[in-house]
């Protein structure tokens, strides 16, 4: 049902106008229903504002209020229409009066804002003012005006007349460019200083890093040396340590393939070491036996680099009886015609011994003068040169040749012994004269005969050793690719290098002597065999 204003319209309109009148003290009026009817009436009016209105509101009824509030910013009066629905009001009554607010707002016109309220908190003054500020313009009539604006000068222009003499002042320009140049120099110096400091910092970091790495490498080398086996490696040239295989935890991280490879390398090194040791022992044995046989069965060769002339003459006199003919053994008796057994002929000294004595005396007297002129320092040099003569092959022994002769040849040699002794006498005289001339010429040149002969023999011996060493290079191969040794058991080579003394110990890995003199393993598919 609709609301009814017929019975109390005059009182309602009078109360509404009192609130609208600015000269009236009444600033609020409250309206309600008579009993359970829809007839609207005036409940109360007052001038105490919103706080006084809250005292007359009943939480169990439906009521309407028209309020006047002064805006503190603008000083203007604002009017509110409040639709009060108490929390304790019957629900059916709320539904019935829900549509009455439209008719009431038409009667009580002039309100700036219509709000719904259910309790006293909804009618708080601050909340009402905040809602009014959102629906009204932001006026500030009562706010104090700002300070008096400063007096403004007459409107002018920024144009200034160009004065060429002032604009083109040379001194000002020079000062400007000098200032710019000084600033540029300062900037460059600051930039150089920053670069220098940065470079110094980088060098310091690099130096500290290198020192740290050097200490780590030393520790690594010490730990690796302790873990190395006790055998002596065949290779003599140093090989770079592999950082992967010298790590402290390398022994624990070996794979099966690496263990097999190391075992194979160890076995190959032991085999090569045994072969080299046996070869060295055999070479030493043969060399010592050859020297002993040469000393027992042969006379010393007449070499000026080894002995002095006086020593040669003494040896010649001592070995002269060895050149005597060997007595022929008795002939065996023939079974057909027996002959008397003849006693063996005694060993008769060669007739050349007697004439050799004056020759030796003459030679000794001649050599004595030469020996006095020679410095004493030549003797150690001759002794040192004797140490290198063991590698030389001893000359053919005369006694061996005599022993190999038949008895008939021995008999014929006895007949020619006298003639041979005379020829030896002449030969000795010739050698003495030549030696004296050589000693005098060497003395004038500033070098002794022993030094020259020792140097000549050393060169000859070195050539002989090189020929003996390079005579057998074994199986050779030429490198097709370059290879870098992974550890100390392998060799390094470049394309075109020749590898000698190759031992094909495995299908994929061979051993040989590299171009740098090291002996070790290398991959077989990196080389080709040289025929």
From Swiss-Prot:
It comes from the Eukaryota. Residues 289-300, 387-422 have a biased composition (Polar residues). Residues 324-340 have a biased composition (Pro residues). GO terms for biological process: chaeta development; neuron projection morphogenesis; positive regulation of axon extension; positive regulation of synaptic assembly at neuromuscular junction; postsynaptic actin cytoskeleton organization; regulation of actin filament polymerization; terminal button organization. It is found in: Cytoplasm, Cytoskeleton. Residues 191-220, 285-307, 319-340, 386-448 are annotated as: Disordered. Disulfide bonds: none annotated. Residues 2-133 form the ADF-H domain. The modification Phosphoserine is found at residues 242, 328. Residues 472-531 form the SH3 domain. One of its GO terms (cellular component) is axon. Its main location: cytoplasm. Residues 431-445 have a biased composition (Low complexity). Actin-binding adapter protein. Binds to F-actin but is not involved in actin polymerization, capping or bundling. Does not bind G-actin. Does not seem to be involved in actin-based lamella protrusion during cell migration. Belongs to the ABP1 family. This is Drebrin-like protein. The gene is Abp1.
């Amino acid at each position: 049902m609709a609301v009814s204003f017929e019975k109390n319209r005059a009182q309602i309109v009078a109360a509404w106008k009192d609130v609208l009148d600015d000269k009236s003290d009444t600033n609020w009026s409250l309206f309600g229903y008579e009993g359970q009817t829809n007839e609207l009436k005036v409940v109360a009016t007052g001038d105490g504002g919103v706080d006084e209105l809250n005292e007359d509101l009943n939480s169990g009824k439906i009521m309407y209020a028209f309020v006047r509030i002064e805006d503190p910013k603008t000083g203007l009066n604002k009017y509110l229409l409040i639709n009060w629905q108490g929390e304790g009001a019957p629900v059916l009554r709320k539904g019935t009066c829900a549509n009455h607010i439209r008719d009431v707002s038409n009667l009580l016109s002039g309100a700036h804002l219509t709000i719904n309220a259910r309790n006293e908190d909804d009618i708080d003054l601050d909340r009402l003012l905040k809602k009014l500020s959102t629906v009204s313009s932001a006026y500030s009539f009562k706010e104090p005006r700002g300070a008096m604006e400063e007096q403004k000068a007459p409107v002018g222009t920024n144009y200034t007349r160009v004065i060429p003499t002032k604009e083109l002042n040379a001194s000002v320009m020079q000062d400007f460019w000098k200032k710019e140049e000084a600033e540029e120099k300062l900037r460059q110096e600051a930039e150089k200083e920053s670069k220098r400091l940065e470079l110094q910092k980088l060098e310091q970091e690099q130096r500290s890093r290198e020192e740290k790495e050097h200490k780590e490498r030393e520790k690594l080398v010490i730990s690796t040396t302790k873990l190395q086996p006790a055998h002596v490696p065949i290779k003599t040239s140093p090989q770079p340590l592999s950082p992967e295989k010298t790590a402290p935890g390398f022994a624990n991280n070996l794979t099966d393939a690496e263990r097999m490879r190391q075992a194979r390398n160890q076995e190959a090194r032991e085999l090569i070491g045994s072969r080299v040791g046996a070869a060295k022992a055999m070479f030493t044995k043969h060399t010592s036996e050859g020297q002993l046989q040469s000393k027992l069965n042969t006379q010393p060769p007449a070499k000026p680099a080894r002995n002095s002339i006086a020593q040669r003459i003494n040896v010649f006199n001592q070995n002269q009886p060895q050149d005597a003919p060997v007595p022929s053994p008795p002939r065996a008796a023939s079974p057909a015609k027996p002959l008397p057994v003849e006693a063996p002929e005694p060993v008769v000294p060669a007739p050349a011994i007697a004439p050799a004595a004056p020759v030796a005396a003459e030679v000794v007297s001649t050599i004595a003068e030469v020996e006095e002129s020679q410095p004493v320092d030549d003797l150690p040099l001759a002794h040192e040169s004797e140490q290198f003569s063991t590698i030389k092959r001893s000359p053919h022994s005369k006694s061996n040749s005599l022993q190999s002769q038949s008895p008939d040849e021995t008999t014929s040699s006895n007949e020619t012994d006298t003639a041979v002794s005379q020829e030896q006498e002449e030969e000795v005289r010739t050698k003495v004269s030549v030696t004296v001339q050589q000693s005098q010429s060497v003395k004038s040149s500033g070098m002794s005969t022993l030094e020259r002969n020792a140097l000549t023999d050393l060169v000859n011996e070195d050539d002989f050793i090189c020929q003996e060493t390079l005579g057998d290079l074994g199986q050779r191969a030429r490198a097709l690719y370059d290879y870098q040794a992974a550890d100390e058991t392998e060799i390094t080579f470049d394309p075109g290098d020749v590898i000698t003394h190759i031992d094909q110990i495995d299908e994929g890995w061979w051993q040989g002597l590299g171009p740098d003199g090291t002996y070790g393993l290398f991959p077989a598919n990196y080389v080709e065999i040289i025929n």
